Amino acid sequence: MKKSFIHQQEEISFVKNTFTQYLIAKLDVVEVQGPILSRVGDGMQDNLSGVENPVSVHVLNIPNATFEVVHSLAKWKRHTLARFGFNEGEGLVVNMKALRPDEDSLDQTHSVYVDQWDWEKVIPDGQRNLAYLKETVETIYKVIRLTELAVEARYDIEAVLPKKITFIHTEELVARYPDLTPKERENAITKEFDAVFLIGIGGVLPDGKPHDGRAPDYDDWTSESENGYHGLNGDILVWNEQLGTAFELFSMGIRVDEEALKRQVDITGDQERLQFDWHKSLLNGLFPLTIGGGIGQSRMAMFLLRKKHIGEVQTSVWPQEVRDTYDNIL
């Protein structure tokens, strides 16, 4: 049992260390330290889809403030790029840890404990567009493939990802599969192409519903991208043969500018957020134009090591029936 446990840990560390090295080199970002707590009221917390409740923390020696365990560092990263004067094309990545206790379900792919490579870059002048989004997606996808090939060489786990990733808009997906749910559409397109970047998540689609929810104040999901389609963000999905389903590795996007922020808070009814310090800074032009996202570390390890449950690659909390069902839960 000890030998198996140690081997399991070595595999996880190999995936994380290898991916980190490739990501820093290929994406040209610097690794920095990030916070676990966010001060309530400054607007820095990631509100995700807007319904999740964060973990509240009271610090004994800071009695006049309340803090929350971060959901992600989406807005902190942009603030930090501005604070320290990062230039166009430069960026950072954080080994982020977070808690999301309001996850809809604790299942094979969802945990209350979140670990991500949380990254952000300043967009070069004139490149706040779909072409730059796609270029960045292709760079990160190359990092995934390089890591998969390294895992294959070390552990004899066959590489399965295609050389190229397929891009498709959520509007195209609705037209292609009008009778399917968003999840069923993801399964259908990902099973066909094995690796897909789904563009435009958050805005209302021709069927009257968004593909999925997104907060209004980090990704730009309303600007026109091309051919009448909207959204400069998306998800990377791969086909997971172990689970027989599409598997989201991470979300990313070009971040809101002043106009997109105002437009999106009007759509979601979150205009009160514009009174927060973070949002005022953005509206006053104090933040650079950026692109960023969060790459799930445990999800990456789970996929590349062909595990059937995320609890096999991270230590979290689970109902007893999960531990009874899966032998290798950590």
UniProtKB/Swiss-Prot annotation:
The EC number(s) this enzyme carries: 6.3.1.1
Biological process annotations from GO: L-asparagine biosynthetic process
InterPro entries linked: aa-tRNA-synth_II, aa-tRNA-synth_II/BPL/LPL, AsnA
The UniProt record lists the keyword Signal: no
Any one GO cellular component localisation term in the record: cytosol
Keyword vocabulary terms for this entry: Amino-acid biosynthesis, Asparagine biosynthesis, ATP-binding, Cytoplasm, Ligase, Nucleotide-binding
Chief place of localization: cytoplasm
Catalytic reaction list: L-aspartate + NH4(+) + ATP = L-asparagine + AMP + diphosphate + H(+)
Uppermost EC category: ligase
Family named by the database record: Belongs to the class-II aminoacyl-tRNA synthetase family. AsnA subfamily.
Record's protein name: Aspartate--ammonia ligase
Record organism: Streptococcus equi subsp. equi (strain 4047)
